[in-house]
Amino acid sequence: MKITQEEVSHVAKLSKLAFSPEETAEFATTLSKIVDMVELLNEVDTEGVPFTSNVAANINYMREDVAQPGWNREELFQNVPEKERGYIKVPAILDDGGDA
């Protein structure tokens, strides 16, 4: 399956990433090769092989949910670079609008 440069550019835009035309072409080629390798798995004969969703015998061990004391607020706020109205202020990672 061929991944086009347009598809790579579209996903990059949705991910807020910017690539040069050379990088976009390289990603398209590499991703196409990866998809081709994964598609080879469709040719594997699995007749008679039992379905397994997990080969390890995992067991969920539950514990009682007990509230524990949290951080000392004053001590915590001594270690933050910026605070505003009782909250820790962090840099914005999302802008207004966009396709995503």
From Swiss-Prot:
<dbReference type="InterPro" id="IPR003837">
    <property type="entry name" value="GatC"/>
</dbReference>
<keyword id="KW-0436">Ligase</keyword>
<dbReference type="Pfam" id="PF02686">
    <property type="entry name" value="GatC"/>
</dbReference>
<dbReference type="GO" id="GO:0006450">
    <property type="term" value="P:regulation of translational fidelity"/>
</dbReference>
<dbReference type="GO" id="GO:0050567">
    <property type="term" value="F:glutaminyl-tRNA synthase (glutamine-hydrolyzing) activity"/>
</dbReference>
<comment type="function">
    <text>Allows the formation of correctly charged Asn-tRNA(Asn) or Gln-tRNA(Gln) through the transamidation of misacylated Asp-tRNA(Asn) or Glu-tRNA(Gln) in organisms which lack either or both of asparaginyl-tRNA or glutaminyl-tRNA synthetases. The reaction takes place in the presence of glutamine and ATP through an activated phospho-Asp-tRNA(Asn) or phospho-Glu-tRNA(Gln).</text>
</comment>
<comment type="similarity">
    <text>Belongs to the GatC family.</text>
</comment>
<dbReference type="GO" id="GO:0005524">
    <property type="term" value="F:ATP binding"/>
</dbReference>
<dbReference type="GO" id="GO:0070681">
    <property type="term" value="P:glutaminyl-tRNAGln biosynthesis via transamidation"/>
</dbReference>
<protein>
    <recommendedName>
        <fullName>Aspartyl/glutamyl-tRNA(Asn/Gln) amidotransferase subunit C</fullName>
        <ecNumber>6.3.5.-</ecNumber>
    </recommendedName>
</protein>
<dbReference type="InterPro" id="IPR036113">
    <property type="entry name" value="Asp/Glu-ADT_sf_sub_c"/>
</dbReference>
<keyword id="KW-0067">ATP-binding</keyword>
<keyword id="KW-0648">Protein biosynthesis</keyword>
<comment type="subunit">
    <text>Heterotrimer of A, B and C subunits.</text>
</comment>
<keyword id="KW-0547">Nucleotide-binding</keyword>
<dbReference type="GO" id="GO:0006412">
    <property type="term" value="P:translation"/>
</dbReference>
<dbReference type="GO" id="GO:0050566">
    <property type="term" value="F:asparaginyl-tRNA synthase (glutamine-hydrolyzing) activity"/>
</dbReference>
